[in-house]
């Protein structure tokens, strides 16, 4: 595409390609490659699909002096990341109750666009949640203190401020506390089927044959 400053690199196989006919996400990869200060390449991972500006699954790095910051490039759920929860359950134990577990997860975790969470907060509580992060949820009984040791920044950004959170954002965010979301948001019950690095796995307390939950 005219104006591309770097190449586009897309990590997919033939099987994924079949499902992408008519999808404009390839064009979005090219569009990202035209942005000022982009470095090396406009990259897309295997979960690529159409987004707001960037494709979902898009990755781009920009020069700190000449690049751009695009908060709404993919969407508005900034800091949408992935968290792995370890467990002491073996695969055999979970398989016995697989159907029941699946039903309970769906019954207790609201999913989809426009769903409302079961955790009810006042605006004052919501403000505290935004400023204190996971620490607030632990104090509210939704986790244990040890959990915080395994979360980036201990689950709380020290400089977090409620000052610039507008009324519309509060209105949208309050009912969504405790929901999973939609699109490419997911919850998977997984098995550690193979260990590739014993030392690293030991640090994360990952054991072969045991169950983890990826959110």
Residue ranges and their predicted role:
Residues 1-39, 68-72, 78-208:
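Glycine-rich, flexible loop motifs
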Residues 45-59, 68-84, 211-215:
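Conserved phosphate/anionic-ligand binding catalytic regions in large, soluble enzymes, centered on
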């Amino acid at each position: 595409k005219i104006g591309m400053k770097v190449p586009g690199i897309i990590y997919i196989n033939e099987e994924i390609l079949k499902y992408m006919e008519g999808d404009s996400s390839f064009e979005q990869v090219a569009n990202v490659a035209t942005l000022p200060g982009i470095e090396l390449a406009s990259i897309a991972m295997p979960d690529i699909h159409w987004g707001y500006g960037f494709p979902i699954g898009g990755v781009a790095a920009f020069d700190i002096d000449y690049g751009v910051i695009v908060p709404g490039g993919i969407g508005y759920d900034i800091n949408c990341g992935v968290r792995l929860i370890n467990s002491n359950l073996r695969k055999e134990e979970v398989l016995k109750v697989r159907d029941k577990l699946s039903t309970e997860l769906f019954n207790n975790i609201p999913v989809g666009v426009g769903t409302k969470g079961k955790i009810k907060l006042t605006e004052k509580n919501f403000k505290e949640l935004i400023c204190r992060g996971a620490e607030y949820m632990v104090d509210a009984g939704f986790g244990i203190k040890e959990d915080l040791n395994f979360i980036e920044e201990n689950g709380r950004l020290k400089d977090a401020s409620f000052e610039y959170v507008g009324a519309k954002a509060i209105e949208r965010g309050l009912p969504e506390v405790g929901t999973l979301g939609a699109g490419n948001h997911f919850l998977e019950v997984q098995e550690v089927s193979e260990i590739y690095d014993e030392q690293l796995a030991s640090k994360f307390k990952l054991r072969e044959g045991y169950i983890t939950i990826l959110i």
